Amino acid sequence: MLEVDVEKQLGRFSIAVRFEATQRATALFGPSGAGKTSVISMIAGLIAPDRGRILCNGRLLFDSQAKVNVPPYRRRIGYVFQDGRLFPHLSVTRNLDYGRRMYGLARDHGEWDRIVAMLELRYLLDRRPGTLSGGERQRVALGRALLMRPQLLLLDEPLASLDTARKAEIMPYLERLRDEAGVPMLYVSHHAGELRRIAATVVRIDLGRVVAVGGPELLSIADADALG
């Protein structure tokens, strides 16, 4: 379970959010500029909150009063960005291995085979990122995040840079990830259609505040039209 209660001042924009993520897939939903990426950057340790605390599976990651701020590389949180952020000079195999090696983890061949099969990466392993489609690059980024054996997976608009065809290509892999990977997901998007297929719980955020928490019913047709 993820527990977040943080405040952060970013210039004139302030964030003060409190929520829990207890399901396999929780959505952070809201318009562009609502503060979604800043919130997950605080969870990942890329931005330090001004005040508050963050716990993941009972482990304290940040507490302003106790002066606890676990560095990003020790949080065991997988982060998938909009653009994948693969290393262009490394093969797919070496990109997949990067997170595991950064944490000093031995390769678990059973786990490797399972994730490569789940994301259908076998035929890509010898290729470089520059030869991959956008959807293929995101699948590699997902595999890399999973192979570091994270406690939590953060997905920041993972389909935003893809065209409609590539979005349709990768969505089934995200659904398999939710159902088969065994890692809780916090999925950030302002597109209601994506989140209806992925999330069991929706945390709606606007202007740096949580304005509603509930099920997929929060993703109404009006929201899709207004935000998408």
Residue ranges: model-predicted function:
Residues G182-V188:
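Conserved H-loop
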Residues R59-S64, R107-L124, E175-R176:
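Conserved ABC ATPase "signature" region
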Residues L61-G78, M102:
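ABC ATPase NBD coupling module
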Residues L147-Q151:
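A short, proline-enriched helix->beta-strand linker immediately N-terminal to the Walker B motif
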Residues L90-H109, M118:
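ABC-type ATPase nucleotide-binding domains, specifically the catalytic core motifs of the NBD
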Residues L153-E157:
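Catalytic Walker B motif of ABC-type/P-loop ATPase nucleotide-binding domains
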Residues R128-L132, E136-Q138:
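Conserved ABC ATPase signature
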